[in-house]
Regions:
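N-terminal cap/leader regions of alpha/beta-hydrolase-fold enzymes
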Residues: 1-159
Length: 159
């Protein structure tokens, strides 16, 4: 299903296509949650199938530089339709909101560069712990990343 909404993208991401694909959610449960991490409550978006037998394989979806916007949330929904528990944590939540930045250079210097690698990696560990407490099988844990998130997907795979 296509919609004309461009919700959740930072102004720095312009121009955007006039339509986006949105996965139907009648067979999944999706929404926002809060994950305890390093003394804070990290916002995250998650999606899972409505019906499942036992624990689900887990996919951590690491955001791009524009944060957890509608496209990243839709990736979680697509993964849920395939039988996964998918989680996209808001990894910038301590430093700021990407929607507050009008261009990419300012977004990079004003937000992205301020997020320490050690903080991101620790947050991702807490996402995995949350998944194990919420129906996920962390022995079948995968991670994918987009743009900025690709770096962290590689770092986690190397650890």
């Amino acid at each position: 299903m296509a919609t004309t909404q461009q919700s959740g993208f930072t102004p720095a991401a312009s121009p955007l296509a006039s339509t986006i694909v949105q996965t139907p959610d009648d067979a999944i449960v999706a929404g926002f949650t809060s994950i305890p991490s390093q003394g804070d409550n990290m916002p995250a978006y998650h999606a899972r199938p409505k019906q499942s037998d036992g624990q689900l394989p887990v996919v951590i979806v690491v955001q791009e530089i524009f944060g957890v916007h509608e496209h990243i949330r839709d990736i979680c929904r697509r993964l849920a339709l395939e039988g996964y528990l998918a989680i996209a944590p808001e990894l910038y939540f301590r430093e700021g909101d990407p929607n507050d930045f009008a261009d990419i250079p300012t977004l990079l210097s004003g937000l992205v560069a301020k997020v320490p690698d050690s903080q991101v990696l620790a947050d991702l560990d807490h996402v995995a712990s949350w998944a194990s407490r919420n129906g996920g099988d962390v022995h079948r844990l995968m991670i994918t990343g987009f743009c900025w998130g690709w770096t962290y997907h590689l770092a986690v795979c190397r650890a």
